[in-house]
Structures are given as structure tokens and as C-alpha cells.
């Protein structure tokens, strides 16, 4: 059905209709006459349908009320009176996306599904949640999702608990997050951007139930809403449903959600402390941020221009401003960022791995370098390459498994929220044309002059490390709570105990069957029985296996090279991981690293380098370690892409000592900033490395790599020749024809070109010897407590069930869903207050449980240990079991882009997973019943009794539970 301008349909007026060539879609702007709701519909033939409803939410304090509201609306509503309908949807729908998101000035609720009935169910639950949530009258929702005083008994220690409270404690454990908050405080003292929409842990306990309910009443009205629809759907039925079930129950009202524009408060220069561990060194751990407010960047052309400039000046390996800052010794890790999606966008420079005395030198150097560039002109080759890179990404529209409509729905809010054309943020042809012309007419230089050099609206903020600060803050909080408890009467203490116990009882009580049945669900008959088939042709070119995956790729060819890493020593494995961080950013015999970067940007869609491993399906001692080149480009430029792959793999040199040192030190500084944020990944691989050779190999790129790069960074200035020689040696050892397997994803027509062009790389590689043997990592149970200055934990426990004689089958995929959104969700998130927990079960028998931003430690380990008991008595209705099966399929059957299809095909290839094996797994999954889940209890019990534990988190918490660990260690210093 096509809509017509000026048409009225189901209470909606069609205000405007336009074709959007960039999306190959027809776009309709509508408004709901009675309620005032706005609606944008992007009509096309994409079966991955998307719906979202967003609200402009402008908090006036840092209690996190928008964030807590986002969590809480999905905790039961008028039509769906369950404790957490969101969880029921996750485990019982065919969604391809399901989440909610809090931004500085808006809250979004998007869903996606390829199944029409499922899509309608998702819309129904989400619309009821945002307009009629139980959180308004049920104070236990705020207690659970936001915060509450917690007392187990009158004699116990008074604490704060709450999911968002602990989530934000984890967020603010990262210096980067602290820096972002300080920058926004400095730049926006008088507007909503000057407060933390996610919530500051120090302020969250100030939120009252009355303020919470009032916030929802004010902002969650259709007159303040933005509805978005995308894809192939019956729009007549969809609009009728939205109107009849929801919007017709409201009338237009005035909602004061305006975002005030901050007038320039003058330039700001500020310094703040951040916590590091007691006794930790402070050298090179200061962060600086120079950030400018770019008021006119709501213009999509200006916004795109600043993204191009950010890459040219600060992100490209050839970036001149980054080089100037590094050469001046101001920092080890330099990066840049353009932040749109707010009324007054920001352009910023981050200088990490620095010291406090460097602050005064940053602004003068930046101004000098940029002034010189404006005077002499920016490098046109760099600009052209950066713009080509931007254009390639826009046209490819590969969002790494996320639905296209989801990304478009978020992007359109970049203008729509500020009362501008929503399609302006989705159209890019005009901006590309303007910027192409701008390379030669001084456009970019003019932007630098106007928005940076002549702009007084900036903040220079520094974060200086202070050992023991976190511990002192935690003690002050404990003292504050103890003093508050001491001020309470017996009746008041008893009331807190009663409230705490009542909440725990609610959390432990399952929803009634009647409540569960309010959530519509599909049946097993509705489910796709056949496994996704990925066609792959194999042939041999010059002795190398080449796998071809046919797909429609819009003129793009994807080339993936996998070099076998058998035969490496333990030291060589560390150097291979280092090589993946450096290669492509170093000189070659024919080009400087800057020239290489420019050629990649000019002629390709990017080349990435990584190290990974594919495990044997039935034996974790046997695996395929690989170094991967992941490259893509327009087929018309495939010859240039292959030339670059050939040059980088064969002719990279490590003789530029300064460049080598800069990259090593930048890598180390990056780990210093990111290690805690990726704590769940670190502990997951680390705990499995105690028992699994393949995971020991992966850990060589995680915590072990952080330890390695710390050592290398400490001696790179003196030992550059030795380190460079080892990198060269390992590069020559691994990049051989005998070690190579190639994969190409392209259309049939483009494959003809690839078959002619790609052999040039194969033929250039030395033959080499077939790699043999795997490294002996000397596995042992270390049970480490990794102590940090963070205030939350990442708690992992795992092992291998095949070592106990158990096999893998498809029911374990269903168990994953049951645990993540049942047992662990309740125990770790709902009752424990962690942000989340997840499980992993692998074909080779490796399995792990891990919590994320967890305020607890011992109780989470105890929850893992009690899991087998839970499974032994697991008993749910057939309807509930079917929901778990459906939810499992929704995670497996995600729509694949061409690049993801190629990657999935190669995963099956390297692990020996034939289509027949994949079909067997699916059949087992689809047939899983409660009895099959109970039968898994012995293998879980066996692995938990192996007692492999690894935790990263608060030093105090880890020391309190030191009996759980054989080793207490700190992150590298």
C-alpha cells in the first residue's frame, strides 16, 4: 500500500512523501492528529522490519532518571503484568533486535523482526510498556532497577543496591567515562548536557519515587514521541494497530522538553584526579582532552566534513596533528572524535599516556599546527582518501549484523529531535558532492579556521592519577551509610530490612502462568526447521585452497586471507599478536606508512589485521590458529587492493625505530585505558586458559598480551633493533603460500575478476614449509584474583565438560538462553544488582559463566556452583520451553551481510562443521524439552567442581574473598 500526501489514515495525517535514493526507499512523514505523535515510515522491501518509539528526555540532575526509566518501563505494564516482559521477549520471540537506549537528550525503544506476527507482538509490548508501565505505582521497580537501601538484617551493613547504580559504578570506573563527564560539565554548565543522563553513582540515591513517576508523566506522552517504522510491512494494519490500541487514548498536550542552547561560558581549563591502585606508578597515566563546541554541525554536510577532518588530522596513520602531538612528547596515545547526536555537537582531541605538566603545551601546539595547515592547505591526497573511505562505508551500509533500519532510525534522530528534517541525516549524496568540491576550494581549511581557530568555546580538561583515591571514596561512602544507619530508629531500620526482604521475595517468585500467557508467542510449527545453507566453492590456485562464497555485494569484493600459525613458539605467538597491531601502520620497502595509509583509503574499503583460533569441534587441544587479513574494495580496484596486500605482507619493515616505539607505546597506553572496560573478555579467556590450549592461545592476546606489551613498551626505546628483528622474523615465517587459505565473497561476475587478479598475491608469497605442531602452554589452574582500582567485578568460572566424558549437542544452545535470561538473570542481575551475566558453551567442551559490572564476588561464584541443583529440578510448561527454543533461534538466525556470510562459511570450514552437522544441532535444538535440560545438570556440576575461577575487580573485594584464589595479581603497571 502506498500512502499519499494530505491523506488521513487511522488518525494519522500524511504530511510529506519523498523518495530517498540513498536508501532505495520511499519515506513518509506523518503525525497523529489526536495525540500529536510524529511518525516516520521508510518503505522498502527489506523483510527485517524495525519499529522504535523515542522520547526527548532532558534531565535536570544526575540521578539517572532517564536511564532508570528506560530500564523500568520494561518491568511490567497494563496489558503485560509480568515482572520483566523484556526478558520474556528476549527468550521467546524471533526478534533480530530488542533493546532500549538512553542518550544525553533522548530515550529510544527499538525492536526488529522478520516475522510479521512477532513484529506486531514486539510493538504491542513496547508501546504498552512506555505508555502504561507498572513502575508508576510499584516502588519495587525503582528499588530493583535504580537503587535502594539494603539490609539483610538489623545487624548487617547498610549498602546501596540497584542495577543502574551498579552499572554506572562500572561505567565511572573507566577514566575515559570520567573524562567525558568532566568535559560535558565544563562545556554545558546550564543545560541538560551538563548532567549525567545515565546517572552518577553519587547522585542516583537522591532519586525519589515521586520524582521518578513525575519524570515519566512529563516526558512519556505521545506529543513528545517520535515513532519510526522501516521495511516491508502492511502499513495499513500497522497504523490501525498503533492508533486503535494506543494513540487514540491520548490527546495533544504541551510538553516542555526543549533543549536549551548553551551560550559560550568562555574557554575552560580544568584538572581533576582519578583513582588508580595504591602503590601504582603515576608516570604517563594522565589524560588530557581538548574539546570544541561546533554549533552549526547539525548541518549534515558540516557533520560529515568534521568526521572526515577527524580522520585526516587524528585517526589516519598519516594524521599530521596526531604526529605533531606525539613528536612533541605530549602523549603516547592520541585520538580524535566528532560527537553528533546532540544539539551542540563536539569535536575533540584526546591525549592519553601523558603527564600533568604537558597540559599547558597542548593548546599552543594544536593552534600552531592547524594554523600552518590552514595557511599552506591540507594534504589533498589525505582528504580524498578519507572521503573515499567515508563514501565506501555509506554505500556498503554493513552494520555488522545490526538491522539497517535500526541504524537509520538512530541516525534520523540526529536532526529530527531538534525539529529539523529527519531525512537530512539519512541523505548523503549532496554532502559528498559538496565535500568533493571542497577539497580544492578551501572548504575544509575554512572549517578549521571558523570552528577551531576562531572559536573561544572549548574546554581543556586533564585527569591526573591519584593512588588510593578509589579506596578512600569507597571508605567515605561506607562511613556515610554507617552514620546514616546509626541515625535511624529501630522502626526505621526494621522498615529497610522488611523492604529488602520483600524485594528479594518478589525477585525470587516466578510470574504466574496467567501473567506469562499475556505475552503472545509463536509455536514450534512456526519455526524454520532447516539450517541456513551457505554455498561455498573450493578450488586450488597455485597450491593454495581458495574458497568462494557467492553473494550479491553491490560491486564489492571481500578478500579474507587466513595464515596458519602452527609451529610457533610461545614468544613468537606474542610477537604475532604485536604484529597484528603494527602491520599496515609501518613503512614498507617502497612506501612510508603514511603513503600506505593513503593508498588504502584511496583504493579500498579498508584492510584489518587480527589473530584468532578455530577450535576442533570435539577436542580443545586441537585448534587452527590464524593470522587474518580482512580486506574489501570495489571490484574495479581489486588489482590495487591485491597489490597492497602483497606489499604489506611481504615488504613491511621495522627499521623506523621512532615509528615502532610510538606504535608500541600507543598500544600500551590503549590497554591502560581499556583493560577494565573489557574485564569480562579478559577473565573469560583467562579462566578457560587454565584448562584449554585454544583458550590459552586466545589469552595470549588478552591479559598475557597486556603483560607482554607492558614489558616491550618499557624497553622499546633501547631494544628497538632486537624487537624489530623478531617482528620481521615472525612475519617471514608465517606469511607463506603453504600456510595460506583464501576466501573471497563476491557476485558471480566479480568472482571472474577475482580469479584473474588474486593469484598475483599467491604467486608472490614464498612457498615455505607446511606449519606443524602447536605450542605447549603448560596449562595449570591459577585461580587468579586480578586486582584493580575499579569498583565492580567481572566474575568468571569455567572448564571443559568433554574432559568429563560428555558430548556437545544442540540442547546446550537452549540452556544458554535459559541461563542468561532465567537463572543467571535472576540471581546475578535482578537479585545481585549486576549489569548482567552470560554463558558460553563451545563444541569442544569449553564452557564459562561470567558476570559483568557485578557489585558482588563470592555470591556470584556461589550462584554458579548452585546451577546444577537448579537444573536437576528444572521443570517448565511446554509453552515456556517453546519460548526458550524460539529465543535461542532468534540469536542464531540473524540476517547476514555478505561479509558475515563469508566469515560464517570459513568458521564452518576450519572447525569441520558440515551442513549435516549444523542441521543435526538445529534438530536437537528444536526438539529440546525440559527433560533434556535436566539431563545437562551432571556436566555442569562436574565442571563447577573443577573449581576454575578468575575475577577482575576491586582490590578490596578480591582480598575479602582471597580464599577463592591461588594467586592475587595486579594489572600491569
Language-model features: locations:
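Non-catalytic terminal extensions that flank enzyme cores
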Residues: 1-50
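His/Glu-based metal-binding/catalytic segments typifying zinc-dependent metallopeptidases
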Residues: 43-45, 52-54, 165, 169, ...
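M16 family metallopeptidases and their MPP-like homologs
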Residues: 48-58, 84-132, 139-150, 177-202, ...
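Active-site His/Glu-centered metal-binding helix of metallohydrolases
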Residues: 65, 69-73, 579
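Generic recognition of flexible, low-complexity loop/linker segments
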Residues: 97, 213-217, 275-278, 321, ...
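Hydrophobic, small-residue-rich alpha-helical packing segments that form membrane-like cores
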Residues: 153-224, 228-246, 250-277, 282-284, ...
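Non-catalytic, conformational "gating/processing" segments within enzyme and secreted inhibitor domains
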Residues: 161, 213-243, 724-758, 945
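Extended, regular secondary-structure scaffolds
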Residues: 214, 226, 235-253, 376, ...
